[in-house]
Each structure stands twice: as structure tokens, then as C-alpha cells.
């Protein structure tokens, strides 16, 4: 598994506060049964959310659509 860093995510969402909110909302979606957009590979929802952000699969649009 490739190591995901905050810097990788900040390349996609430059504002670190927005990036944190996006990761939190997406991790909550995953923890209540949301489908991951990447291969889970036994990762926790927070890591999966960060991987999705770093690959550009999840963005700030999630902030307006709500948590679930």
C-alpha cells in the first residue's frame, strides 16, 4: 500500500481545513456502509477517505451535499 500523506491530499484540496472536513465526512459515510471508491485493502475508513481524496475521487462538493 502506498503511504498517503496530508501533502498528497492538499494537492487536490489546498485548504487544509476543507480537506479535513471532506475527509471526516467521507470517513463517516464509509463507516456507516458507504461504498469505497478505491480498493479497501483492510484499511480503516479514515485511510480510505484520504486515499480517495489524494486520487481526486472525492472533493469539496461533499461539503454541500451533506454527510450521508
From Swiss-Prot:
Keyword set includes Nucleotidyltransferase? yes
| Coiled coil location | none
* Molecular function GO labels: DNA binding; DNA-directed RNA polymerase activity
EC number(s) from the headed UniProt entry: 2.7.7.6
Example GO CC term: the record gives: DNA-directed RNA polymerase complex
GO BP of this protein: DNA-templated transcription
Top-level taxonomic group: Bacteria
Tell me what reaction this enzyme catalyses. RNA(n) + a ribonucleoside 5'-triphosphate = RNA(n+1) + diphosphate
Cite the Pfam families for this sequence: RNA_pol_Rpb6 (PF01192)
Instruction: Please give the Gene3D superfamilies that the UniProt record associates with this protein.
Output: 3.90.940.10
PANTHER family in the record? DNA-DIRECTED RNA POLYMERASE SUBUNIT OMEGA
Role, per record: Promotes RNA polymerase assembly. Latches the N- and C-terminal regions of the beta' subunit thereby facilitating its interaction with the beta and alpha subunits.
| Similarity comment text for this entry | Belongs to the RNA polymerase subunit omega family.
Provide the protein name.
DNA-directed RNA polymerase subunit omega
Amino acid at each position: 500500500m502506498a503511504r498517503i500523506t496530508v501533502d498528497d491530499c492538499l494537492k487536490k484540496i489546498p485548504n487544509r481545513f476543507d480537506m479535513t472536513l471532506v475527509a471526516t465526512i467521507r470517513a463517516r459515510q464509509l463507516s456507516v456502509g458507504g461504498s469505497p471508491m478505491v480498493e479497501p485493502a483492510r484499511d480503516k475508513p479514515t485511510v480510505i477517505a484520504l486515499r480517495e481524496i489524494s486520487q481526486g475521487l472525492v472533493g469539496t462538493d461533499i461539503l454541500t451535499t451533506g454527510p450521508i
